[in-house]
């Protein structure tokens, strides 16, 4: 065994306590995690209060999907804070940090698999879209997150990290297509186009920030440190999750009549029944 591989093995066998120590000694990284835990806690309480009078099934479904966003988030950040979903990865030859053990908060990519479908479910219900379109957006989104996780975790080949990044981007394009082309027309027909338009722009602009950060951060070309990258994601999360969800819930609570269908009209091709 060479000296380099011995060091690598040592770090790769780091215990959860070692990882925790490393997180806690990195102020930027640690604060980016704890600020989000605190915010998610406040947001959960706020959303419970905001949704307490919502009665119609479709509006309720939007509310539950929206509530799940900070609920998944607080669990995700608690996983990162404890070191459970953070590990050391030895970057492959060709990577800017080749041979070094880089702290990877991979749990983020894993938990996006659960939070981002909730954002899309809420948006799809708001637009009163059809089930095929909703299924497409959610499955493409899950594909994006899982292949993004693969891109972050691959240590055998630099090229394959970027191949998976490319696959993830292709899934992302499908999500963007649904959001930008299909759902605006559904929202127009459902009478929710104003709020949908605002949330669509917020979502598309902020979501584009994630692959850019990935590419610039330590997973990609390593122009940004682990702490700065983590604050980047945390900042995007605050806007793409809490601000997004707040705007959506505030609108739903004030305009329940506009989303008062059964919540099961999904599959009807977006057309609401006449007596809806
Ligand atoms: C990755 C890297 C690979 C390429 C692409 C990505 C996109 C990620 C996105 C994440 C959105 C996350 C949100 C989380 C809220 O809980 C995986 C970074 C395209 C769009 C909104």
Swiss-Prot record:
Its main location: membrane. Gene3D superfamilies: Rhodopsin 7-helix transmembrane proteins (1.20.1070.10). It is found in: Cell membrane. GO terms for cellular component: plasma membrane. Keywords: Cell membrane, Chromophore, Ion transport, Membrane, Photoreceptor protein, Receptor, Retinal protein, Sensory transduction, Transmembrane, Transmembrane helix, Transport. PROSITE patterns: BACTERIAL_OPSIN_1 (PS00950), BACTERIAL_OPSIN_RET (PS00327). GO terms for molecular function: monoatomic ion channel activity; photoreceptor activity. The modification N6-(retinylidene)lysine is found at residue 241. It comes from the Archaea. Residues 1-21 form a propeptide. CDD domains: 7tm_Halorhodopsin. The keyword Chloroplast does not apply. Residues 22-25, 82-105, 155-157, 217-225 are extracellular. GO terms for biological process: phototransduction. It is a multi-pass membrane protein. Residues 52-57, 128-130, 181-192, 255-276 are cytoplasmic. Belongs to the archaeal/bacterial/fungal opsin family. This is Halorhodopsin. It comes from Halobacterium halobium (strain port). The lineage of its organism: Archaea, Methanobacteriati, Methanobacteriota, Stenosarchaea group, Halobacteria.
């Amino acid at each position: 065994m060479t000296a380099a591989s011995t060091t690598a093995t040592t770090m790769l066998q780091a215990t959860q306590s070692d990882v925790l120590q490393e997180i806690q000694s990195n102020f930027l990284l640690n604060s980016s995690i704890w600020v989000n835990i605190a915010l998610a806690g406040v947001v959960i309480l706020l959303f419970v209060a905001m949704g307490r009078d919502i009665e119609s099934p479709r509006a309720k479904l939007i509310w539950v999907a929206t509530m799940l966003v900070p609920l998944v988030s607080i669990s995700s950040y608690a996983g990162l804070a404890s070191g459970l979903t953070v590990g050391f990865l030895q970057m492959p030859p060709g990577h800017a940090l080749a041979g070094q053990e880089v702290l990877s908060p991979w749990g983020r990519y894993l938990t996006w698999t659960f939070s981002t479908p909730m954002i899309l479910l809420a948006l799809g219900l708001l637009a009163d879209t059809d089930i095929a379109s909703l299924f497409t957006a959610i499955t493409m989104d899950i594909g994006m997150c899982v292949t993004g996780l693969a891109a972050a975790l691959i240590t055998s080949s630099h090229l394959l990290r970027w191949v998976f990044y490319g696959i993830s981007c292709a899934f992302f394009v499908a999500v963007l297509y649904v959001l930008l082309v299909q759902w605006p027309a559904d929202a127009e027909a459902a009478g929710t186009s104003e709020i949908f338009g605002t949330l669509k722009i917020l979502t598309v602009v902020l979501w584009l920030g994630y692959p850019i950060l990935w590419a610039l951060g330590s997973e990609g070309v390593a122009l940004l440190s682990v702490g700065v990258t983590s604050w980047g994601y945390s900042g995007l999360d605050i806007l793409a999750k809490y601000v997004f969800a707040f705007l959506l819930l505030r609108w739903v609570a004030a305009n329940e009549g506009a989303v008062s269908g059964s919540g099961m009209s999904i599959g009807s091709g977006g057309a609401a029944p006449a007596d809806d």
